[in-house]
């Protein structure tokens, strides 16, 4: 397996629509203001978070059960800023739509700027032939409220190419989160 370079990522985004919309450089400022960077990097792609968030709340006592997820434990917020309560959690989604090739898997890592503020971002791997907007999990590990900026970089995807295509892809297995649009809640 090899990690893929900016040249390969750009070629795949432009010829195969692997990432859409695609930004072919690192963007670090907007209107002369510093932002959390996004776009193509040397060996990855920094994706942006959209303005749709689902924030966990305790207004209705509930137990988080991945097999019977109760949406009442969430509040939906459409905003350029998401405030995550202390020691809490929020879901977001990428602006970019991903369409993975059959011989490639992508691993997501968080932005160091967020990590240094106690904000951890988790995403499971984008498996071969996975397609859709990617739901991002933001965890505020601090005892203080934390701010997430919509439209700015949230995480980086690293693309690993196998030496041959897989036998069974995410699409072949009818992956439950395929072709997701927006924040997608857990389902079993």
From Swiss-Prot:
SUPFAM superfamilies, per the entry: dUTPase-like
Catalytic reaction equation(s): dCTP + H2O + H(+) = dUTP + NH4(+)
Classification via Pfam families: DCD (PF22769)
GO biological process: one example: dUMP biosynthetic process
Family: Belongs to the dCTP deaminase family.
Source species of the chain: Orientia tsutsugamushi (strain Ikeda)
GO molecular function, one term: dCTP deaminase activity
Amino-acid positions noted as binding dCTP in the UniProt annotation, renumbered to this chain: 111-116, 135-137, 156, 170, 179-180
Purpose of the protein: Catalyzes the deamination of dCTP to dUTP.
This protein's name: dCTP deaminase
Protein EC: 3.5.4.13
Active site per database record: 137
HAMAP family: dCTP_deaminase (MF_00146)
InterPro entries: dCTP_deaminase, dUTPase-like_sf, dUTPase_trimeric
Record pathway: Pyrimidine metabolism; dUMP biosynthesis; dUMP from dCTP (dUTP route): step 1/2
Enzyme class at the top of the EC tree: hydrolase
Subunit structure: Homotrimer.
Keywords recorded for this protein, A-Z: Hydrolase, Nucleotide metabolism, Nucleotide-binding
Claim: Transmembrane helix is one of the keywords in the record: no
